[in-house]
Amino acid sequence: MPTIACNIIEVCVFSFENKEPLYLMLRRSLTEPLYPNTWQIVTGSIETGETALQAALRELKEETGYSPKKLWIVPLVNTFFSVRHDTVNHTVIFAAQIDSAVPVQLSDEHYQFGWYTVEQAKEKCVWPGQKKALDIVHEYIVGGKEAASLSEITV
């Protein structure tokens, strides 16, 4: 019987350029054993003893060098099945607004990045769950709907 796990986080990172929202996409290194050369939002594992929020802040810093100006919990949990581990994974998703004046500092896990409109970012995504996360962040959080004020996290 498959196990159920919740040990992965994702962070949709955005900033504003001339009042237009742009989303950060990262391209995994060619040497990464899992999904090399694919584009993704910030993604990482929750370490033992760490909360999902702590993992999101750590992964954001490790993968991009950023600390968020604002942070939200996204009203979506991605779910996927790993055949290799016989596990149903639930992924907690966050959104982070960053200061666009600060340059990206990529970790060795990625070799390329770009800032894209929501449609361009979704075109780069491999996984449907990340496309859906970008849609929700764009509509509800960046769009300033009530869900944004209800899901903002003080950092």
Where are the language model's segments positioned?
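Charged phosphate-binding loop/patch that engages nucleotide di/tri-phosphates or the phosphate backbone
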Residues: 129-155
